[in-house]
């Protein structure tokens, strides 16, 4: 818990909302717990949104960090959830046993603001969309106006940033 506390304190300014550990896919540990006790007992494999479940399966099968979202949650307008599956040789004879998943919940607006991507930029209209073409920041119309674009890949998730002059 002290590791989670120091990580949370250092990253809170950049939009970190919570850290959750789910042994066997069921959330057992959440930091900070006092603001998100409803997450304890949540079964990522049974209760989660189908897209979220698919991303968790992808994290397990690929053994890479997988970014989900954005999702509207009760405690933030839109969040991204980064999932990392953990494996333990103790869990299975072949040494590849799935222990569970650690997820980090990130406030999307806070992350974009920390990165300097805000709608208040004076000379540009900005938008960001994920690999499923869902716009997560800005207006979808920006992509229809011949924008300058850049692709950003975070682990196995791609994002497209677009900008047009105002």
What are these regions (language model features)?
Residues 1-160:
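Intrinsically disordered, low-complexity polar/acidic regions
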Residues 164-166:
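Short beta-strand-to-loop transition segments that serve as allosteric relay/switch motifs
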């Amino acid at each position: 818990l002290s590791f989670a506390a120091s990580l949370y304190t250092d990253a809170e300014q950049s939009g970190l909302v919570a850290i959750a550990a789910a042994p066997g896919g069921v959330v057992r540990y959440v930091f900070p717990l006092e603001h998100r006790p409803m997450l304890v007992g949540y079964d990522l494999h049974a209760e989660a949104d189908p897209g979220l479940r698919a991303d968790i399966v992808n994290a397990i099968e690929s053994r890479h960090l997988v970014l989900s979202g954005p999702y509207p949650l009760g405690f933030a307008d839109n969040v991204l959830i980064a999932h990392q599956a953990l494996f333990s040789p103790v869990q299975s004879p072949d040494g590849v046993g799935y222990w569970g998943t650690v997820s980090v919940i990130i406030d999307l607006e806070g992350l974009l603001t920390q990165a300097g991507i805000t709608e208040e930029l004076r000379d540009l209209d900005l938008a960001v969309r994920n690999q499923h073409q869902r716009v997560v920041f800005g207006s979808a119309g920006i992509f229809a106006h011949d924008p300058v674009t850049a692709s950003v890949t975070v682990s196995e998730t791609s994002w497209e940033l677009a900008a047009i002059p105002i």
